[in-house]
């Protein structure tokens, strides 16, 4: 590489000027700030470890001048492994580029995958999802706003995705044979079949519930098809009856003649 690239003029020219990169001051009442992920204990400038994973259950003050945060920051943060939920109360601070030592305050920033809540009023906050259910008993709900409580409720009430059990051909055959014998087997019969096909009794019970629902649907559809066929036969016979009457009348006239 040429030595001219490391000259003093080139190094100074690459630095941004403060006059050219002044940013507007953000309002004090900022919208929620949503970050996609926070790892370890970066908000407090502490090293990650086993103690940081579980010690973050309890609210602690944010250290001034933390990693990437302005000095005028106060509040608390709650965390569990890589999941965090808490509040940061940010005051408006002088804004400027990194070369002047000033850090822009947390404003109306938002991740593109999370919509901004409308009508939000209050201090700047940090909301990172999802929130594990183990954290809920340790959270200070009184400090959360109405919008944050609604989002937290949605995350907490979200149903977990169930894993679908894949049955082998032998298991399906044994289950189907028992279903043909009885649609509602008792607990002892289910346990006996579960030991035979190497399944849990809960799985056998769920399979029978689903199989009965399928059987009802098939029975309902077959009855509807039979009813539709009967209606079609009645309508077709009613349409053909006048023609038959005309043919019978003609045959009677021919016999009289």
Swiss-Prot record:
Keywords: Developmental protein, DNA-binding, Homeobox, Nucleus. Transmembrane segments: none annotated. Its main location: nucleus. One of its GO terms (cellular component) is nucleus. One of its GO terms (molecular function) is RNA polymerase II cis-regulatory region sequence-specific DNA binding. GO terms for biological process: middle ear morphogenesis; neural crest cell fate specification. It is found in: Nucleus. Residues 160-219 bind DNA. Residues 241-257 have a biased composition (Basic and acidic residues). It comes from the Eukaryota. Regulates chordin (CHRD). May play a role in spatial programing within discrete embryonic fields or lineage compartments during organogenesis. In concert with NKX3-2, plays a role in defining the structural components of the middle ear; required for the development of the entire tympanic ring. Probably involved in the regulatory networks that define neural crest cell fate specification and determine mesoderm cell lineages in mammals. Belongs to the paired homeobox family. Bicoid subfamily. This is Homeobox protein goosecoid. It comes from Pongo pygmaeus (Bornean orangutan). The lineage of its organism: Eukaryota, Metazoa, Chordata, Craniata, Vertebrata.
């Amino acid at each position: 590489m040429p030595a001219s690239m490391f000259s003093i003029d080139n190094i100074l020219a690459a630095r941004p000027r403060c006059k050219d990169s002044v940013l507007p001051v953000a309002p004090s009442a900022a919208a929620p700030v949503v970050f996609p992920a926070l790892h370890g204990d970066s908000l407090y400038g502490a090293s990650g470890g086993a103690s940081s994973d579980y010690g973050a259950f309890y609210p602690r003050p944010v250290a001034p001048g933390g990693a990437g945060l302005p000095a005028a920051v106060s509040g608390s943060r709650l965390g569990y492994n890589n999941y965090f939920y808490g509040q940061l109360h940010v005051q408006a601070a002088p804004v400027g580029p990194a070369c002047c030592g000033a850090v822009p305050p947390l404003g109306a920033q938002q991740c593109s995958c999370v919509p901004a809540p409308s009508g939000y009023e209050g201090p700047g906050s940090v909301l990172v999802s999802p929130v594990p259910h183990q954290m809920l008993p340790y959270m200070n709900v009184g400090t959360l706003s109405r919008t944050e409580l609604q989002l937290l409720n949605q995350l907490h009430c979200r149903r977990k995705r169930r894993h679908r059990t894949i049955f082998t051909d032998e298991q399906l055959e044994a289950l189907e044979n028992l279903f043909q014998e009885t649609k509602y087997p008792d607990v002892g019969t289910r346990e006996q079949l579960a030991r035979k096909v190497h399944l849990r009794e809960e799985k056998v019970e769920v399979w029978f519930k689903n199989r009965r629902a399928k059987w009802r649907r098939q029975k309902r559809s077959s009855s509807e098809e039979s009813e539709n066929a009967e209606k079609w036969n009645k309508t077709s016979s009613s349409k053909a009856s006048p023609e038959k009457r005309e043919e019978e009348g003609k045959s009677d006239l021919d016999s009289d003649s």
